[in-house]
Amino acid sequence: MIIFQIFKLVMENSWVDFLFGPYLAYSNAQIIIECTAVFFGIASVLYSRINNILVYPTGLISTALYVYLLWQFELLGDMLINAYYFIMSIYGWYYWTRKHNGQIAHPVTRTLPKERQQAFFLFFATLFLIALVYTFFDKWNGITALVDTFTTGLFFVGMWLMARRKIEHWLCWIVGNIISIPLYFYKGLTLSSLQYAIFTVLAILGYWQWKKHYLSKEVIA
């Protein structure tokens, strides 16, 4: 109960109580799982920003933990996001490491018109799928489920584009992360809400870094 006692001690500050009060009702296991998932989630985005393959093993750990945690908090859309992330991380890991004549087979590029069409199809197909999931489990509770469904669509597209090393995947992350900050805070997952605030900053930096990298290669070519 050490973690519970630590949270209880810092509750003397009203702002701390406002931010972290819900954690008093959580088990030690839930707090440890969320902290670990947040740590590896941030590490994964940092590696993604610098176009490093370690984005995938760190991401696999974070997403696996979040699947379990989000099921408990009935955020079914985000739970499916992380299950999808897990699968796409395996695909991305393979895709990024492929080489042709000793060179990286799939460098950073922009999305093509056909890929944009595929992205739109994936987005709307995801909205339909997540709406069905919420309805099937009788968890459609208004605005929270609606927002969760929308961000799920953005993140599905973002992960697919990232696995294919497309610059525009960062734009999906930026919008989705901004929306997720109040969503997770409302659900009482303050650490995850703060994580998405950090993700937003990293996504903006990542977008400019990938764009700069792409333009430098284009000039050389």
Walk through the language-model features, giving the residues of each.
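Hydrophobic core of alpha-helical transmembrane segments in multi-pass integral membrane proteins
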Residues: 41, 116-136, 200-203
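Hydrophobic, membrane-inserted alpha-helices
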Residues: 37-44, 61-67, 153-158, 174-182
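Juxtamembrane helix-capping/reentrant segments at transmembrane boundaries
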Residues: 104-121
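Membrane-helix interface "capping/anchor" motifs
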Residues: 46-57, 160-172
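Alpha-helical transmembrane segments in multipass membrane proteins, preferentially the mid-helix core
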Residues: 131-142, 149-167
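Loop-to-transmembrane alpha-helix initiation sites
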Residues: 78-81, 188-199
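Short, strongly hydrophobic alpha-helical membrane anchors
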Residues: 1-31
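Membrane-water interface of transmembrane alpha-helices
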Residues: 84-102, 211
